[in-house]
């Protein structure tokens, strides 16, 4: 048949092939459906709801099931659900395993715990592309940072009814997918015992299709973005589109339209087929008339044979050169194998050397531990000696104070005795007089009053001592704070002086050796595949007008400002070596990243507030995109007032993760989620440029010095107020104490006077005793003073003894610290060697794999060389069949294939011309006749087959279109009924209205407070969220997918609606045996809703490690 094409249309052959293929597919499907109806008599995914398997007969009727205990009955789930998920080095998971239930599963955990990574792993493991997960454009982006590969293992149940090839796979089907950084991803389909059945993706797709798991259906596996898009669809057209895609109605419509287009195109081409058939018939009739023989001239045939031989010998020469090139390629690959082998040998030698050195270091550590213990023992002994000397010193001091107190008391007694003696001497000349009984009563009253005064005096003494202690504590606190602020001010003044002298201190803000590090990188830049870039803070500048946000922005992205960027792991290792050689002590992050420029405008924060991107200038666009990747700066907004920022975040603005607010020059606020507020302290050193680095933070340092000076004065004033208050209290207590002592003195004097008058006799005995007592007191004072001088000498002696002990204490402490530092250094050294050994082992495995690939390539090329040589020999034999190579060289023939082809065409035309002039032989006429007849009969048969196939296709399309309309009505009806049932949970009513003309889906809700149903867009936030959740469940109802998943369905719900929504999900999905449902949420489901069902499984993820430095509520 002659190939005919029409401008603007597909070739007829392609249309015919598609038509026949479609017809054959239809017939196969009908035959399969007939076989299925004969074998099972059930519909896909719902086939086991009406009947239950019986152990003996294979089925048990529904009436038998009805007799079972309805309280304990739980419908058995069919095969195909995911039993276990195992992840290795996938996204944030290093080694993770999770067992899932056959029905409803909740995966709960805090943000950052890796919940969404589980859903991503399931979709990727079942054959989805990376772009379908909204987690990256390439599968390699999903490999855990620092790792060469990631592995996803899914265990599918195959033990129940509806199993897939159970005789081959057993009770489990294991799907394994491996992602590599330096190679393509691979699949593996294994049986229950781990035996690999297939490694082809199409076989895994066959299993997935068998269990009816539409991985590519966006409504089957709703990621965070997909769930957000569906649950917040703003227009009725969006809702209609989501519903039609999820229930596959849209795909069916597109397939029917495509089949109709094929049918119409085939009908148009039938006329061309008929014309071709007529042309074949004419050729067939002409062939009958040919009777003459054709003779060919011998010269033309000879020339044609030589040309064909020359063409074959040229091919032999070309293939011989190609064989030599392949052999040269083998030599090159073998050289690479030798290089990789040398690298493996070097790594193994390093591993042996580090292992040997590690044993030596461990021995040094053991010796150093003993040495540290000895130094610690010496230090403890010195401490004990110092403590004993201090105890003696304090004891002698106490004795000295006691002696001084006794001296003061003795002198007071001497003064009192002098007065008494003077009074007695005066009384000797007087007569004793007065009422002694009255004086005794007055004496008793004075003794009681004196006792009360003594108690008051003791209380005031204690209070006075307490207030003095408080005054001393306040003074100590004041000195400590003043000393800290003064030291900070002095440091900043020194930094300002360095800047004024022209010393560039900007790089020292990252590390004191940063300038040395940059010089070393510049000197060794040829060793890098791509020179390292950093620190990133030196490539960023605060725009004019945003200077007040400098510290707040630096605090928000501080982890990225210190970082350096390298392009591959090799440069990463080289950069770490350079850092160690330059003595970098700061924590410098190293980011392995290939700089690129991309459009992130769709991810920018929505609102009238500026973002960090608006406040920064970057040295080049690639650096800007790097900060977007590292710190999400396009989603951090700048709002001065924290209350305004909180109100803005509570409105859930699009693409906003955090807001920064100002507080003072030393601290600020970071807000996220509308409810969380962290108070952060700014760093003193500036690690990004301000106004093109014109001042390098000079003005900020001056402002900070001025502020700290004011703060210093404020501290002085504050403590002065405290001290004034304490001293006022001290003065008051001291005045009361003096008054009390005066009262006691007067009382004692009067009591002494009364006692003397009561016991007075006219004699000199009392006077003499007082004189003797005064003499004894004076002698005691003299002895106390001598003891005091002796104690002073002892104290000086103890102080002299303490000096060498203090020096010994300091020296032992210093030796202990040095020994501990050396021990720590040895431990860090051995840890570093262990990490290097592990790295070299990983490198060895990597190079072994690389060597294996090289060797396999050599084997493949050797096979190709052998095949090529064998082909060359066959070509030589074919060429020799025409003529020898020597004969070709002696004949004047063209040297290129193009020239040979042109001359062959010319010779062939001359032969054809001769044939036309001379006619054909009888055999040739017969051959031509047979050929034309066969072509005509074949064309006629194919025309009839196509015509019949078109008729069958037309009838099938009409039947399929009618079935689609019925299915569409049934699907919409099921969704509407399920939606209505979900609304009853909150005592609402309503319906789904599908409008085909405008392709829109309207949702009408009648709440308990409404008289008339309203559109869902007019509802409150909670009611709207509940309605959207009911719509999602209604969409799932007719989907009949074996597995469905939803990520963070409650992200826009408050606590009340979250509880209602969760209760609705549990009620609707917990008893559905044909579908395994996976719900991911950051909320604790156990606290939100009461869940007590064997059909519900809750899996709690481990919380991520993070710190909260907020002091907002302190």
Curated annotation (Swiss-Prot):
Coiled-coil boundaries: 259-529, 696-969
InterPro entries named in the record: P-loop_NTPase (IPR027417), Rad50/SbcC_AAA (IPR038729)
Protein's UniProt keywords contain Translocase: no
Residue ranges, annotated region (Flexible hinge): 530-695
One Pfam family linked to the record: AAA_23
SUPFAM superfamilies named among the record's database cross-references: P-loop containing nucleoside triphosphate hydrolases
Primary subcellular site in the record, as a coarse category: nucleus
Domain notes: The flexible hinge domain, which separates the large intramolecular coiled coil regions, allows the heterotypic interaction with the corresponding domain of SMC5, forming a V-shaped heterodimer.
Family: Belongs to the SMC family. SMC6 subfamily.
Record-given protein name: Structural maintenance of chromosomes protein 6
Gene: SMC6
């Amino acid at each position: 048949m002659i190939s005919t094409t029409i401008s603007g249309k597909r070739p007829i052959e392609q249309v015919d092939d598609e038509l026949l293929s479609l017809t054959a597919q239809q017939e196969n499907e009908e035959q399969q459906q007939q076989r299925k109806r004969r074998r099972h008599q059930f519909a896909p995914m719902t086939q086991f709801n009406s009947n239950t398997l019986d152990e003996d007969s294979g089925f048990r009727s529904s009436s038998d099931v009805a007799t079972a205990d309805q309280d304990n009955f739980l419908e058995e789930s069919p095969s195909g659900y995911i039993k276990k998920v195992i992840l290795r080095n996938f996204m944030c998971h290093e080694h993770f395993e999770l067992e899932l239930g056959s029905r409803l599963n909740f995966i709960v955990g805090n943000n950052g715990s890796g919940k969404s990574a589980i859903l991503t792993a399931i979709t990727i493991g079942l054959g989805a592309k990376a772009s379908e997960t909204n987690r990256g454009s390439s599968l390699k982006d999903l490999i855990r940072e620092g790792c060469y590969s990631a592995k996803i293992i899914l265990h599918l149940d195959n033990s129940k009814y509806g199993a897939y090839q159970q005789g081959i796979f057993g009770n489990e089907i294991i799907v394994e997918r491996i992602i590599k950084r330096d190679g393509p991803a691979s699949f593996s389909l294994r049986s229950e015992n781990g035996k690999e059945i297939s490694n082809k993706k199409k076989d895994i797709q066959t299993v997935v299709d068998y269990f009816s798991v539409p991985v590519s259906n966006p409504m089957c596996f709703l990621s965070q973005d997909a769930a957000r898009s569906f649950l917040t669809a703003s227009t009725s057209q969006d809702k209609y589109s989501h519903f039609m895609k999820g229930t596959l109605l849209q795909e069916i419509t597109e397939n029917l339209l495509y089949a109709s287009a094929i049918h119409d195109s085939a009908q148009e081409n039938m006329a061309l087929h008929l014309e071709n058939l007529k042309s074949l018939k004419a050729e067939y009739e002409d062939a009958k008339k040919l009777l003459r023989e054709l003779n060919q001239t011998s010269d033309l045939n000879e020339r044609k044979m030589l040309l064909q031989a020359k063409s074959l010998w040229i091919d032999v020469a070309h293939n011989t050169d190609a064989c030599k090139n392949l052999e040269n390629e083998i030599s090159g690959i073998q050289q690479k194998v030798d290089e990789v082998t040398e690298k493996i040998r070097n790594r193994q030698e390093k591993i042996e050397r580090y292992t040997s050195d590690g044993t030596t270091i461990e021995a040094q550590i053991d010796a150093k531990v003993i040495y540290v213990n000895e130094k610690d023992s010496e230090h403890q002994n010195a401490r004990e000696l110092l403590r004993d000397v201090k105890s003696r010193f304090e004891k002698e001091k106490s004795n000295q104070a006691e002696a001084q107190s006794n001296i003061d008391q003795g002198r007071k007694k001497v003064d009192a005795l002098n007065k008494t003696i003077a009074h007695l001497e005066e009384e000797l000349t007087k007569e004793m007089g007065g009422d002694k009984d009255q004086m005794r009563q007055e004496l008793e009253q004075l003794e009681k009053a004196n006792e009360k005064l003594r108690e008051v005096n003791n209380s005031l003494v204690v209070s006075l001592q307490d207030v003095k202690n408080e005054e001393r504590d306040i003074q100590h606190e004041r000195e400590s704070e003043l000393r800290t602020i003064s030291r900070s001010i002095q440091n900043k003044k020194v930094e300002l002086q360095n800047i004024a002298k022209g010393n560039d201190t900007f790089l020292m803000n990252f590390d004191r050796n940063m300038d040395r590090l940059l010089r070393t990188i510049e000197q060794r830049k040829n060793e890098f595949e791509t020179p390292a870039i950093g620190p990133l803070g030196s490539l960023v500048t605060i725009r004019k007008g945003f200077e007040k946000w400098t510290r707040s922005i630096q605090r928000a992205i501080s982890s990225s400002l210190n970082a350096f960027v390298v392009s591959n792991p090799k440069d990463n290792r080289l950069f770490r070596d350079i850092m160690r050689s330059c003595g970098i002590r700061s924590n410098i992050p190293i980011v392995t990243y290939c700089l690129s420029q991309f459009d992130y405008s769709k991810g920018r924060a929505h609102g009238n507030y500026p973002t960090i991107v608006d406040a920064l200038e970057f040295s080049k666009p690639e650096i800007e995109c790097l900060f977007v990747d590292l710190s999400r700066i396009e989603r951090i907004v700048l709002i001065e007032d924290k209350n305004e920022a909180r109100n803005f975040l509570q409105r859930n603005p699009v693409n906003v993760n955090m807001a920064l607010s100002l507080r003072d020059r030393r601290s600020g606020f970071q807000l996220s989620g509308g409810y969380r507020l962290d108070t952060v302290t700014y760093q003193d050193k500036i690690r990004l440029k301000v106004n093109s680095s014109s001042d390098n933070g000079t003005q900020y340092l001056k402002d900070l010095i001025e502020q700290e000076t004011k703060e210093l004065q404020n501290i002085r004033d504050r403590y002065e107020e405290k001290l004034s208050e304490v001293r006022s209290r001290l003065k008051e207590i001291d005045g009361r104490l003096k008054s009390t002592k005066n009262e006691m003195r007067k009382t004692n004097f009067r009591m002494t006077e009364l006692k003397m008058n009561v016991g007075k006799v006219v004699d000199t005995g009392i006077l003499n005793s007082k004189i003797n007592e005064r003499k004894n007191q004076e002698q005691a004072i003299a002895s106390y003073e001598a003891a005091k001088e002796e104690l002073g000498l002892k104290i000086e002696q103890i102080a002299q003894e303490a000096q060498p002990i203090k020096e010994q204490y300091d020296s032992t402490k210093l030796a202990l610290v040095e020994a501990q530092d050396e021990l720590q250094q040895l431990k860090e050294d051995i840890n570093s060697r262990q990490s290097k050994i592990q790295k070299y082992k990983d490198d060895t495995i990597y190079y072994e794999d690389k060597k294996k690939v090289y060797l396999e390539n050599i084997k493949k090329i050797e096979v190709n060389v052998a095949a090529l040589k064998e082909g060359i020999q066959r070509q030589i034999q074919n060429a020799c069949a025409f003529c020898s190579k020597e004969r070709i060289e002696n004949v004047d023939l063209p040297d290129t294939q193009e020239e040979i082809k042109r001359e062959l065409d010319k010779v062939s035309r001359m032969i054809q011309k001769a044939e036309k002039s001379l006619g054909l032989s009888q055999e040739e006429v017969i051959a031509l006749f047979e050929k034309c007849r066969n072509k005509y009969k074949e064309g006629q048969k194919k025309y009839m087959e196509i015509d019949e196939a078109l008729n069958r296709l037309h009838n099938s399309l009409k039947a399929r279109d009618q079935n689609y309309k019925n299915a569409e009505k049934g699907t919409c009806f099921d969704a509407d009924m399920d939606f209505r049932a979900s609304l009853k949970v909150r005592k609402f009513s309503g319906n789904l209205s599908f409008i085909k003309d405008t392709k829109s889906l309207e949702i009408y809700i009648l709440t308990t407070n409404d008289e008339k149903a309203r559109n869902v867009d007019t509802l409150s936030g909670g009611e709207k969220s509940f309605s959207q959740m009911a719509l999602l469940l209604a969409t799932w109802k007719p989907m009949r997918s074996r597995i469905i998943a939803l990520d963070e369905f409650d992200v826009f719900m408050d606590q009340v609606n979250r509880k209602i929504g969760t209760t609705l999900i549990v009620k609707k999905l917990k008893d559905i045996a044909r579908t395994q449902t996976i719900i991911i949420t950051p909320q604790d489901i156990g606290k939100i809703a009461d869940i007590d069902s064997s059909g519900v499984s809750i899996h709690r993820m481990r919380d991520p490690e993070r710190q909260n430095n907020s002091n907002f509520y302190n």
